[in-house]
């Protein structure tokens, strides 16, 4: 699938990939095909493309209502619909009172019509091509391209990416201390602060080749690569923002992190699960997500069906829970985005005040980082990740970010170390040995 994306990016611009083998959450990989119309929100907050109206989510809902159709055949999740990219600064539309720094990317949000897909089921090993009515030609072209394509790019060595420049540590420590002052004053309870790394893109290396290295160095259940408007988004995210399947909705918050150590996992996991700080932060964010789902769901249907499980990834251990509910019949995809975006685990609590504080303390737009990407199917099903463990390639430069949640008893130096642990796998894709 990655080979098709690399060779024919105009026909197959998006791969939604589960690169974490053996994890039940990332069951399907989807190569989206047949790109057509678009709805785009630019960095000047102007809307382009499909529909009328002043808001991205409203236009998306109107477009979906016009095009909606039946669910795809079981067990497949997609047989036509939309690719969705939601940059972090879409938060300014979701919460109009926010005044955030501008996005560093030309596209803040994108809904891109896709008429077909090549899908692989990691559970059964089956692969199929599905297309919506009227898109048989797209499916036939996909079938022909699949038969003729060469091997996918592998995670082999690349030339040096050039010097990797890390944001000044003291700048981050100062932001942490400022956040702690706000917490002590009762302004917020928790705030997720991020920092940035930049490097020249490795010469002669395509985004697909770089993505192959990323998913090998840092596998994630909600990975993917998307190319549009001279930007490539490469993600190896472990975190789901939201899934809607039928009338069931799930969100899966991650909060609580420890690095994996060469000496073994047991001590690190024991410290993580015993930490009163990490447990309190996690429970607070579960409550935030329950509140978000409560705005959408039938009364009494919201519940936590997985509580504080530990998941181990290539470079870190995380505490993870799952919150689910039964959607009301009147809830639309745009309403789901408005209620849950951006994710509470990468903003803080209370969410709106935290987003304003993050903008003030970080001082620059986040772009793709802590936004979301995924699909919306014709029947209203959707699946979106949170864009963490993600790099952006644009204009010959690669940028990535990592953050940590600041709470009352945070140690700024520990939080600085946590950002480095989270960034480690992404940096290794660029050739870093740290």
Question: Residues of each region from the PLM?
Answer:
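Extended alpha-helical targeting/anchoring segments
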Residues: 1-434
